[in-house]
Curated annotation (Swiss-Prot):
Protein location: Cytoplasm
Function: One of the essential components for the initiation of protein synthesis. Stabilizes the binding of IF-2 and IF-3 on the 30S subunit to which N-formylmethionyl-tRNA(fMet) subsequently binds. Helps modulate mRNA selection, yielding the 30S pre-initiation complex (PIC). Upon addition of the 50S ribosomal subunit IF-1, IF-2 and IF-3 are released leaving the mature 70S translation initiation complex.
Key word Amino-acid biosynthesis present: no
Protein name: Translation initiation factor IF-1
Domain S1-like: 1-72
Length: 72
């Protein structure tokens, strides 16, 4: 997936799901299922409930996302 095709949005982690999946509430109120990007997995970035994150979505399926950044 090319960078130009992605939609980046801010959100908050609502709950942790199995297999490193998370339920994220976006700023616009929508709730999506998100997984951690490979670089965050490789560097052992921990994500907890309530964390502010940046997610990347494809325009083809707006119910799934990839977490690409965790705000401090």
């Amino acid at each position: 997936m090319a960078k130009e095709d992605c939609i980046e949005m801010q959100g908050t982690i609502l709950e942790t799901l199995p297999n490193t999946m998370f339920r994220v509430e976006l700023e616009n109120g929508h709730i999506v299922a998100a997984h951690i990007s490979g670089k965050m997995r490789k560097n052992y970035i921990r994500i907890l409930t309530g964390d502010k994150v940046t997610v990347e979505m494809t325009p083809y399926d707006l119910s799934k996302a990839r977490i690409i950044f965790r705000a401090r």
